[in-house]
A protein has these predicted regions:
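An N-terminal assembly and electron-transfer interface module characteristic of large anaerobic redox
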Residues: 1-151
Length: 151
């Protein structure tokens, strides 16, 4: 991602004026061993399956893709983002093959069936409804570990 000083003025102004949440003391739980965890990906790369509705500027919703999907597209609005590595190997941003290898080798318990993508750079407050829906879906699927991949 580009430096904020190199962004267009309108983007720089938008990002500079975002209210960031204040976190007091987070609640932590003792995690289970990695070999028992079910892992799902959440990314802000605006990734979706080919044919799904593309993300729009400051989209508040999310897209779902399956652990077996490989025909994925990135519709992130940041023009300064270099997509060349992604175009050669989707594992650069969505490491599904690596996670499946880790599960097969017993390093992690399993890979969730569903994974989630958002449009980065949107106001987090406007995404809360969608984020809660994703959390609900992950809980239903037994996900206890999320691999966060910001773009």
């Amino acid at each position: 991602m580009t430096k904020i000083t190199e962004m267009p003025a309108v983007a720089r102004g938008f990002i500079s004026n975002l209210d960031l949440p204040v976190v007091d003391e987070p609640d932590w739980t003792i995690p289970s061993p990695p070999q028992e965890r079910r892992v799902s990906i959440v990314t802000t790369a605006a990734v979706s399956r080919r044919g799904d509705k593309p993300f729009s500027w400051l989209a508040r919703d999310h897209r779902v893709f399956n652990k077996n999907d490989r025909d994925l597209v990135m519709t992130h609005v940041a023009v300064e983002f270099d997509r060349s590595a992604w175009q050669q190997d989707l594992n650069v941003i969505i490491p599904l093959d690596r996670l499946n290898e880790m599960a097969n080798d017993g390093e992690i318990g399993s890979v969730a069936d569903e994974h989630y993508s958002f449009m980065g750079a949107a106001d987090p407050v406007t995404m809360e409804k969608s984020a809660r829906e994703v959390a609900r879906k992950m809980k239903q699927e037994g996900v206890d570990t999320v691999f966060l991949i910001p773009i």
